[in-house]
Amino acid sequence: MSRTFFVGGNFKMNGSLESIKAIVERLNASELDPKTEVVISPPFPYLLLAKESLKKPTVSVAGQNSFDKGDGAFTGEVSVAQLKDVGAKWVILGHSERRTINKESSEWIADKTKYALDNGLDVILCIGETIDEKKAGKTLDVVRSQLDPVIAKIKDWSNVVIAYEPVWAIGTGLAATAEDAQQIHHEIRAYLKDKIGAQADKVRIIYGGSVNGKNSGTFKDKSDVDGFLVGGASLKPEFVDIINSRL
């Protein structure tokens, strides 16, 4: 099954007007793999700036979160309609930092995923285990438990990208090996196939966690690793190398 390679850049709570402009200008000036779909996710205040400045047809923008209801009295939240209004095509949901710092449950993430999809935003759905869960041999149990509430609510997965991001690898420099990522991605796809059928073969499963310009090429021949969700390196020139890692 041929799946379009996908590279997301999650800027998290980083950036300024000047630095976001510089990142977008670097992407505009670079030769990017035309077969790779690229999505950048700057902080909310800079989404419109990024969208209006981008000149590459293969690059779009994403919100870092969205709410599971429409506009209203929800201080501090952002709606799907607002993200679409500034040109966002995607939203990142379920990131481990949202799960831990903001105490978001898998059930609520499933609600937000369904609402986003029903209202026209594509979703990058993040799953992944902690170091203690990994050491206890519970990786697959954890990711399945994170997927199950979404599986219960979503019938059409064509606009979902799953990002497997082991919590122990995020921002630590301890990336999973390409072989380990392939094995886990294969298991995730097999579980999906059991639950949602043949469409699982079309769902892109990307890896996140200390991906950089040096290690991204090691994943090149892994059939179930369909791209990357990149954190810190997406703010640096090496992001272009990651985008072009399959060339």
UniProtKB/Swiss-Prot annotation:
One of its GO terms (cellular component) is cytosol. Pathway: Carbohydrate biosynthesis; gluconeogenesis; Carbohydrate degradation; glycolysis; D-glyceraldehyde 3-phosphate from glycerone phosphate: step 1/1. Transmembrane segments: none annotated. Its EC number is 5.3.1.1. It catalyses: D-glyceraldehyde 3-phosphate = dihydroxyacetone phosphate. The keyword Nucleotidyltransferase does not apply. It comes from the Eukaryota. GO terms for biological process: canonical glycolysis; gluconeogenesis; glyceraldehyde-3-phosphate biosynthetic process; glycerol catabolic process; glycolytic process. Keywords: Gluconeogenesis, Glycolysis, Isomerase. It holds the Pfam family TIM. The active site is at residues 95, 165. One of its GO terms (molecular function) is triose-phosphate isomerase activity. InterPro entries: Aldolase_TIM (IPR013785), TIM_sf (IPR035990), TrioseP_Isoase_bac/euk (IPR022896), Triosephosphate_isomerase (IPR000652), Triosephosphate_isomerase_AS (IPR020861). Substrate binds at residues 10, 12. Belongs to the triosephosphate isomerase family. HAMAP family: TIM_B. Homodimer. This is Triosephosphate isomerase. It comes from Yarrowia lipolytica (strain CLIB 122 / E 150) (Yeast).
